[in-house]
Amino acid sequence: MFNMNLLSTPSSEEGSPQNRSSSMSSVEGKKDRDTFTNLQNEFDGKVFGVSLEESLKVAQEEVIIQKSTNEIGSIPVVIAKSGKYLKENALDTTGIFRIAGSNKRVRELQAVFSKPPDYGRKFEGWCDFNVHDIATLLKRYLNSLSEPLVPLALYDIFRNPILENPKINEHKEQIIKDYEDIYMLLPQQNRHLILYLAALLNLFARNEKKNLMSASNLAAIVQPSLLSHPKDEMCPKEYEASRTVIEFLILHASDIIPNTEKANKDTMPHAGTVAKFNNITVPEMAIDSDEEDFVHPSIDDHMLPRSRALSDSNNFTIHHHHHHHHALFPSPIDFDNNGLSVPRSFKGRTLSAESLSPRLSKLLGNVGNSSNTGIKDPTERVPRGEHKTKHKQRQSWLRRLTSPSRTQP
């Protein structure tokens, strides 16, 4: 039986930010999930309901993506602003990201971050909203993206390190190394947003004893927006595998350093030095520089497709990283009709499949084989209408899976 009992969304009373029930009716849950689909015409369609690339064209903000490297990158304004507020005000809030906000207030926030010319960059009126409204806004943006953050062409490759190593803890270091390679196959803007979200959610996982939101619970909430594919939408086993991947990325947010960033980590000046000489302000980061890094709890004997969570709140260790700034690079692999086979030169370096780990090189060599990946065209994108239809089907499946009759022991 899958451990899905925390996926159901508790209710919220629209008129009272302070009085939240811990359980949500299926009618209210469906209303919240379908809000964007039903009301998308109220907004200009430049921030919500478009691709990440299109959204960044009108509303992006620079942030420090990873504490361990002080990598600076651009993410959507709505994610940067809501993430910053939640980090400062909601780390100890019970059920954060699980409890739904008020549809009315979330729509108001959505309108703010959809309105030109600043698209919410100057917004400071958080006092009229509560943390559940703001967390729901962040989720709504992710759920409205026209494609998951891991492109469909990389879906199988991105899951492979976990699927090949069912006993995750025994192969933890190798899995981390594989993801350091695989991250570099992502488009730069997708990589930056996933890294930021993993670091942000890592903070909430660290406070699981207070907010009751483990890395497993958080991964289940964001997984459909980060790592999903139409061919696996209605398969519980595949859903669980993808959730486990996202959980691993959250738990190891400070350990996984994409390879180009690692290569430049020891040669570039500290972010503060860059700010001093370039007269810039170092932007908000997901994890403050004075906070300790969270190292994942023990995950011994975790086996797929079993649903046992990776996290164990009774086993924590802490370590520290030195902070460096480094250059930014685009995704080194181009997409063409024959697969991921065209190396891209960047900053004087070329990253080819052969320069990656042997396992990843083998995967790249087979990515064009539809029998291996299930993808006929590696550049395929799910049409927006089909994506929304699949999203509704997935939510219907989740409601059935998390119904009281399915979740009771």
UniProtKB/Swiss-Prot annotation:
Keywords: GTPase activation. CDD domains: RhoGAP_fSAC7_BAG7. The record marks R98 as: Arginine finger. Residues 377-386 have a biased composition (Basic and acidic residues). It comes from the Eukaryota. Acts in signal transduction. Activates RHO1. This is Rho-GTPase-activating protein BAG7. The gene is BAG7.
